[in-house]
Amino acid sequence: MVMTDPIADMLTRIRNANMVRHEKLEVPASKIKKEIAELLKREGFIRDVEYIEDNKQGILRIFLKYGANNERVITGLKRISKPGLRVYAKADEVPRVLNGLGIALVSTSKGVMTDKDARQLQTGGEVVAYVW
């Protein structure tokens, strides 16, 4: 079966693995998924991400992060712009998530970045997802 929304699939896999406190998960790789995973690592939501070559499209292995008492670092993930309904934001309309406690992933002409980075660079784009 053809996957219509690979980004939503990746976010769902992260959400599900996080709910049962798995240490790591694997998703089929793509350029945008790798950018999103690297961004989540930079923002401290996941511990590590590595690319594994498999002579097809590759695999991203994502290592989840948990707090001192095994509490979840990622409390929520939500896909915003979907294939059936794209959501775009101008530079001055980039949304804040939980008054800055979470991040919005924005796909711009300069790559995938957080809402904070998009505001600093004064660039808009497609609002991919919210993470908090």
Curated annotation (Swiss-Prot):
GO terms for biological process: translation. The keyword Glycoprotein does not apply. Gene3D superfamilies: 3.30.1370.30, 3.30.1490.10. Keywords: Ribonucleoprotein, Ribosomal protein, RNA-binding, rRNA-binding. Belongs to the universal ribosomal protein uS8 family. Part of the 30S ribosomal subunit. Contacts proteins S5 and S12. This is Small ribosomal subunit protein uS8. The lineage of its organism: Bacteria, Bacillati, Bacillota, Bacilli, Bacillales. The gene is rpsH.
